[in-house]
Amino acid sequence: MATAANQIGRVTQVIGAVVDVQFEGHLPAILNSLETKNGGNRLVLEVAQHLGESTVRAIAMDTTEGLVRGQEVTDTGAPIRVPVGEGTLGRIINVIGEPIDEAGPVKADNVRAIHQEAPTYTDQSTEAEILVTGIKVVDLLAPYAKGGKIGLFGGAGVGKTVLIQELINNVAKAHGGYSVFAGVGERTREGNDLYHEFIESKVNADPHNPDPSVKSKCALVFGQMNEPPGARARVALTGLTIAEDFRDKGQDVLFFVDNIFRFTQAGSEVSALLGRIPSAVGYQPTLATDMGALQERITTTTKGSITSVQAIYVPADDLTDPAPATSFAHLDATTTLSRSIAEKGIYPAVDPLDSTSRMLSPLVVGEEHYAVARQVQQVLQRYKALQDIIAILGMDELSEEDKLTVARARKVERFMSQPFHVAEIFTGSPGKFVELADTIKGFKGLVEGKYDHLPEAAFYMVGTIEEAVEKGKKLAAEAA
């Protein structure tokens, strides 16, 4: 640790987000946080390289306009530290832990450095366990692993945000766990919308006029598109640090990253400014290392778990691009949202044939769950294969067996829809959390033909199969 006398350095060069600082004597360690004043505001820099004997190259966490050569910079002697604990819930903070929602300072339990070691092998839990989300289609066909990493794919307007909100809501209700949302390099407007939607759907209390009946369940950390690459490259770590603190207190935490591609993109911008020779497609040479350092910290320990849901943008829809390809290596499950399903009015618009999970194995979920999931996929796959024939020749040309398959598949499709708690304000129908046993029982009955007598409409936007039967009776009574 440096003494006070040699903790002061001076700016020698500013190139965009990269600042060189000269220190007399003791050099700050790599990843140390340096501080200076810029137009009355605190500007934080993070040491990235040592150049020669007395100069360090640092990355700015905010804009560097207004910095001048010769300006004083202080070495804090530690990495960037951010507030953690329940005081962060319902608040929006930035990469360096400052509140940006204009609701006063964050009442934190303590602070924690954003750079942490991944948990050791001895601390990690080895049991494969499912995180029940209460969302039928996810729990049946692409179940999430506790402490796993899930990739969320979907275009604009197919319901990613609503699905994320429902997951936050359900994890809080079913597991008593908190969530952390890291907005990495996305639109500021979307972050603002999300913040207000969380308050409207009672996921969070409004910090400006708190409602005592609403308890905040989610902390928000933002480093948006307009921010310098330093902030975007580190904001995911800030969010993860808050999540790790909740996990170490014995909770099952959900950690959302929107968007993991922007984390890589920011790393690539910083890398070029630091003068590193780029690798494939112009990405940073340390692409896999950076991604690994983040992803390896997301895991289940003997105390609790962090389950991460990561929205993944695929540049030009090219899955072989190094950025998405590197993130795929870490995923345990993928949830793909499909526009064609959303167009049918089936929400959540999860594609049952395109979403996958490593947990869907008889050894983890049990024989019955596995068999039902495979039967459901088989029925849907057969329906998909028959769609061309139906489009050209019509339903009448199908064999009796195929007609039955199509009828069941359409019921299965509709039964995969379900009303969400967070969408109650738009739909007017109360949300449903469906237990795993009820989900398996419902789909098992459907594919076995127990409910062939019920109309399709009975299965649309209900929770359990019992509700579908009730709805079927109601529809029959209305028709009569």
Swiss-Prot record:
It is found in: Cell inner membrane. Its EC number is 7.1.2.2. Keywords: ATP synthesis, ATP-binding, Cell inner membrane, Cell membrane, CF(1), Hydrogen ion transport, Ion transport, Membrane, Nucleotide-binding, Translocase, Transport. Gene3D superfamilies: 2.40.10.170, Bovine Mitochondrial F1-atpase, Atp Synthase Beta Chain, Chain D, domain 3 (1.10.1140.10), P-loop containing nucleotide triphosphate hydrolases (3.40.50.300). It holds the Pfam family ATP-synt_ab. It catalyses: ATP + H2O + 4 H(+)(in) = ADP + phosphate + 5 H(+)(out). InterPro entries: AAA+_ATPase (IPR003593), ATP-synt_VA_C (IPR055190), ATP_synth_F1_bsu (IPR005722), ATPase_a/bsu_AS (IPR020003), ATPase_alpha/beta_chains (IPR050053), ATPase_F1/V1/A1_a/bsu_N (IPR004100), ATPase_F1/V1/A1_a/bsu_N_sf (IPR036121), ATPase_F1/V1/A1_a/bsu_nucl-bd (IPR000194). SMART domains: AAA. It is a peripheral membrane protein. One of its GO terms (cellular component) is plasma membrane. ATP binds at residues 154-161. One of its GO terms (molecular function) is ATP hydrolysis activity. F-type ATPases have 2 components, CF(1) - the catalytic core - and CF(0) - the membrane proton channel. CF(1) has five subunits: alpha(3), beta(3), gamma(1), delta(1), epsilon(1). CF(0) has four main subunits: a(1), b(1), b'(1) and c(9-12). PANTHER family: ATP SYNTHASE, ATP SYNTHASE SUBUNIT BETA, MITOCHONDRIAL. Produces ATP from ADP in the presence of a proton gradient across the membrane. The catalytic sites are hosted primarily by the beta subunits. Belongs to the ATPase alpha/beta chains family. This is ATP synthase subunit beta. It comes from Bradyrhizobium sp. (strain ORS 278). The lineage of its organism: Bacteria, Pseudomonadati, Pseudomonadota, Alphaproteobacteria, Hyphomicrobiales. The gene is atpD.
